[in-house]
Amino acid sequence: FIHHIFRGIVHAGRSIGRFLTG
């Protein structure tokens, strides 16, 4: 359960970073 949440956070972080870098 915790691992799933952590993976979700990491994925969200990458998505945000990718969006900011365009």
UniProtKB/Swiss-Prot annotation:
Identify residues that carry Glycine amide: 22
Which protein is depicted? Piscidin-3
Instruction: Please describe the organ and tissue distribution of this protein's expression.
Output: Mast cells in gill, skin and gut, and in lining blood vessels in the viscera.
The species is Morone chrysops x Morone saxatilis (White bass x Striped bass)
Subcellular compartments? Secreted; Membrane
State where it is primarily located: secreted
What topology in the membrane does the UniProt record assign?
Answer: Peripheral membrane protein
Question: What InterPro entries would the database entry show?
Answer: Antimicrobial12
